[in-house]
């Protein structure tokens, strides 16, 4: 191999190694920002064709469901709130410290983001749907596939 080809080969190898390293670093940096979406029944029973995809403790995720009537417990001394999210086949407890959205109420559809701890979600953000007719696409798709008839479970009173 002459010197010219050897240099060309070294440049190509260096570029490929650099691209591989950059891709690895980007993936490592983004892994903490990836939030997977689950419904309460998927957290309890798993999802996929054989229900093998079950989230593990410490995993960051988003859970969407309806706030169970009678489950909201507020701590009078702090902003801590505990409530349960449900769908047709499961119930998951959520603990949250902070100010809840104005539209948060029992029977309302919400999405909570946080870390799963022993089957309960320790939430750091709660999002409430803004209109009775609006459902986030992720929740609507999950309800259509797994939980038919849940869209009209409870109409909020005014």
Curated annotation (Swiss-Prot):
This is Cytochrome c-type biogenesis protein CcmE. Heme chaperone required for the biogenesis of c-type cytochromes. Transiently binds heme delivered by CcmC and transfers the heme to apo-cytochromes in a process facilitated by CcmF and CcmH. It comes from Tatumella citrea. Heme binds at residues 130, 134. It is found in: Cell inner membrane. Keywords: Cell inner membrane, Cell membrane, Cytochrome c-type biogenesis, Heme, Iron, Membrane, Metal-binding, Signal-anchor, Transmembrane, Transmembrane helix. Pfam families: CcmE. It is a single-pass type II membrane protein. GO terms for cellular component: plasma membrane. It comes from the Bacteria. Residues 1-8 are cytoplasmic. Residues 30-158 are periplasmic. GO terms for molecular function: heme binding; metal ion binding. The chain crosses the membrane at residues 9-29. InterPro entries: CcmE, CcmE-like_sf, NA-bd_OB-fold. PANTHER family: CYTOCHROME C-TYPE BIOGENESIS PROTEIN CCME HOMOLOG, MITOCHONDRIAL. One of its GO terms (biological process) is cytochrome complex assembly. Belongs to the CcmE/CycJ family.
């Amino acid at each position: 191999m002459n010197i010219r080809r050897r240099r060309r080969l070294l440049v190509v190898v260096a570029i490929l190694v650099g691209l591989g390293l950059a891709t690895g670093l980007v993936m490592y940096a983004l892994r903490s920002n990836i939030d997977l979406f689950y419904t309460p029944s998927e957290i309890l029973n798993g999802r996929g064709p054989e229900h093998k995809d079950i989230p593990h403790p410490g995993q960051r995720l988003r859970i969407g469901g309806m706030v169970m009537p009678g489950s909201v417990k507020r701590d009078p001394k702090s902003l801590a709130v505990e409530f349960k999210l449900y769908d047709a086949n499961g119930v998951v407890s959520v603990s949250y410290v902070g100010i809840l959205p104005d539209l948060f109420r029992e029977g309302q559809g919400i999405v909570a983001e946080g870390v799963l701890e022993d089957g309960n979600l320790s939430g750091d953000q709660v999002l409430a749907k803004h209109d009775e007719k609006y459902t986030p696409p992720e929740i609507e798709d999950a309800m259509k596939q797994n939980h038919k008839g849940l869209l009209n479970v409870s109409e909020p009173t005014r």
